[in-house]
């Protein structure tokens, strides 16, 4: 990939982050949703290898005795921009509908190739499966939102 194209991608990413900051000033995160941020799913120190967990602070009697269905949120952005924080209000809404939500960060083009992004997501799913079973989640009932 040429440097000119890479620079266009970096500019789009910077513009997106500025727009996200303005949007976040107008929105309020709900008090009844717990947000656990920046859990590393790989121990390599990259911010791109973290995930957030969203779960409702209010557990209904029905939910108390069953494992919660899971949504894995993978932010959009054409593989070149975006971040897991962009969808935090959406993830909170999903929690209110009875899901536990994992929002995954991954490396972006042009800093990596598409295959690397697939590997990031695969490693995040492995981490969730191996390490976060204490969240009362139902692994047989997983939906991925891209």
What role is predicted for each listed range?
Residues 8-66, 118:
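N-terminal cap/lid segment of alpha/beta-hydrolase-fold proteins
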Residues 144-146:
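Short beta-strand immediately N-terminal to the catalytic nucleophile in serine-hydrolase-like folds
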Residues 57, 78, 108-110:
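Feature marks short, surface-exposed loop/turn motifs that line or immediately flank catalytic pockets
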Residues 65-76:
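Short beta-strand element of the alpha/beta-hydrolase
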């Amino acid at each position: 990939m040429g440097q000119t194209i890479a620079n266009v991608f970096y500019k789009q990413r910077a513009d997106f982050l500025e727009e996200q900051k303005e949007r976040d000033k107008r929105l309020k995160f709900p008090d009844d949703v717990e947000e656990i941020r920046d859990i590393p799913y790989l121990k390599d120190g990259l911010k791109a290898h973290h995930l957030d967990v969203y779960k409702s602070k209010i557990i209904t009697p029905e939910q108390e005795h069953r494992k919660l269905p899971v949504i894995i949120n993978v932010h959009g952005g054409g593989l070149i921009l975006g971040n897991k924080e962009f969808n935090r209000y959406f993830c909170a809404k999903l929690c209110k509908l009875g899901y536990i939500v994992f929002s995954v960060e991954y490396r972006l083009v042009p800093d990596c190739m598409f295959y690397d992004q697939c590997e990031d997501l695969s490693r995040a799913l492995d981490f969730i499966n191996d390490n976060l079973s204490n969240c009362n989640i139902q692994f047989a009932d997983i939906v991925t939102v891209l």
